[in-house]
């Protein structure tokens, strides 16, 4: 069934470009930029990809991102991801990038954006993959820092379709960024936010009511709140679910416990995505395949999940 799933036309709506940095490219960029790495080789780095929680993953993720220095680096990162999309019949992408991960290291905002944007434009021209780029704020940093990042983004307003919110969830509720999101919306941005991954269902309520998001990234803990489930179904609010990420970060102990198909059958508009595929062992097709292998997902369910992803695009 893998080949059939691979050929299914689909969109990817929850993908961090920095999370597509495969070990081989990481080492190549480190060599190009003359950066010493704490790992001896690709295999040693791959062995480090064993996480017990979100924070352990983030620590490695930010360490890996340090090799991204130049416009060409960001182009190469994005282009490698788009080639993977072409191979898996992902026809539309709405990736996140985290400018603060780079500007806090002294990399100018416009350098990061120029490389990513050029690759996305080439992806549309040369590979036929449509896109919309989402600027994501790091929630473990302050509201003031998010406001500064929004200031940096405004001269490039036409480069983005939306703002988002990611990084360490627990202790950083969506309400912390309500004023930033209000301002972003007043500037014409759509909004999305990570909520209900490690954080409680209350964070999903906040994202909907305070940040006024178009869709929820992750959202799997909505299953614990029946009233919230009813709202998601009634309003057809999309959830961008990332199955392999959820098991790798121990949101679910095992894929057999994942609730995505239960949510689908109840009428929630769930989609399948890869989140940080270089770190979690699979791109979109591998995530679909894991659901088929562990949960017995049928072809009909796969078609619905793929159609949900196309329907839930911010750029139609």
Swiss-Prot record:
Gene3D superfamilies: Metal-dependent hydrolases
Cofactor note: Binds 1 zinc ion per subunit.
Sites annotated Important for catalytic activity: 218
Binding site residues for substrate: 276
Pfam families, A to Z: A_deaminase
InterPro entries: A_deaminase_dom (IPR001365), ADE (IPR028892), Ado/ade_deaminase (IPR006330), Metal_Hydrolase (IPR032466)
Paired cysteines (S-S): none
Any one GO BP annotation for this protein: adenine catabolic process
Residues the entry annotates as binding Zn(2+): 14, 16, 194, 275
Enzyme Commission number(s) from the entry: 3.5.4.2
Gene Ontology, cellular component aspect: cytosol
Record GO terms (molecular function): adenine deaminase activity; zinc ion binding
Protein function: Catalyzes the hydrolytic deamination of adenine to hypoxanthine. Plays an important role in the purine salvage pathway and in nitrogen catabolism.
Family membership noted in the UniProt record: Belongs to the metallo-dependent hydrolases superfamily. Adenosine and AMP deaminases family. Adenine deaminase type 2 subfamily.
Name by which UniProt lists this protein: Adenine deaminase
Source organism of the structure: Pseudomonas aeruginosa (strain UCBPP-PA14)
